[in-house]
Amino acid sequence: KTTFFNLLTGFDEPDTGKWQFDGTEVGGMASHKIAQMGMVRTFQLTKSLGKMSVMDNMLLGAPNQKGEKLSFSLLRGAWRKQEADVRERAVELLERFNMSHMAEEYAATLSGGQRKLLEMARALMASPALILLDEPFAGGNPALVQSLLGHVEALRDEGVSVLFVEHDMDVIMGISDWIVVLAEGGVIAEGTPAQVSKNKKVIDAYLGTDDGIAADDGRTGADAQ
């Protein structure tokens, strides 16, 4: 499932196959170009930059910053307004994720749960149309899981598409509109929560019955929207 995300977002090169995002073929496209198109992701193992502050991590998430270009770097007047807008967006997102009081702390000092929140907030700096979340709830305590679920639901209400990988069927069934279940490297079911919950192959995969599909050992999981 992570390999699937890596291919979609340009972190791995495909051997074969084609796919499109918003009408544009993106297979093999560089990851930063895919992000600029509006498809962003988080990682199963968070990628926060520990020696930078939470705020600086957020600022790095904004695309197409004029001040990063050599031709503009010495002309601050050309990008000062954009810089202020980017910082304002970062402040708003940190407040939304209840992290504004941590803005100047080093990312390395954050707990695992706080890093998950930071990674999701940083991804939203790109104002994406589609966000891919790789096991966002894994290892989280109940309070963190509920917080993350609330953010996912808010994104959906705002018109942002969310595709996430998750193993917890209760979480998947409770929040998803459409589910794709993978086992042993292949799709075994696809449909609405009501449809998937009645699928015998899904029941076998998660309960470890005798259809030849092992119980969930990390090779079984679901991509949900």
Describe each model-derived feature in a short phrase.
Residues 9:
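Helix-to-loop junction immediately C-terminal to a conserved catalytic motif
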Residues 17-24, 36-37:
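Conserved ABC transporter NBD signature motif
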Residues 70-102, 132, 150-153:
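Conserved ABC ATPase "signature" region
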Residues 106-110:
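Conserved ABC ATPase signature
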Residues 127:
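Conserved catalytic motifs of ABC-family nucleotide-binding domains
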Residues 172-174:
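A short, surface-exposed alpha-helical micro-motif characterized by mixed small hydrophobic
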